[in-house]
């Protein structure tokens, strides 16, 4: 398992995949597809240019995994503020993926 990949549960029905700049694309794509198969919905969060780059590539690869089952994704990007170190607020991008 990629040590830079975090899958967290926000509540009973919602999972968020947190991507860093060092996250492996293939592993992230597999995690996205796995969560998507379970609940037809997943959030991918990335903060920083490298993390966003890795997240976008992983979403593209996950889309090809999901397409094999005759499904396609809608990707809705948005921004959130998260608390970083020393109480600094960091802006992150959240990609919300759902069925078309």
Where would I find each of the regions flagged by the language model?
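Long, polar low-complexity intrinsically disordered regions
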Residues: 1-9
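A general secondary-structure signal for short beta-strands and their flanking turns/coil
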Residues: 12, 39, 88-92
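Short beta->alpha linker loops
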Residues: 23, 47-50
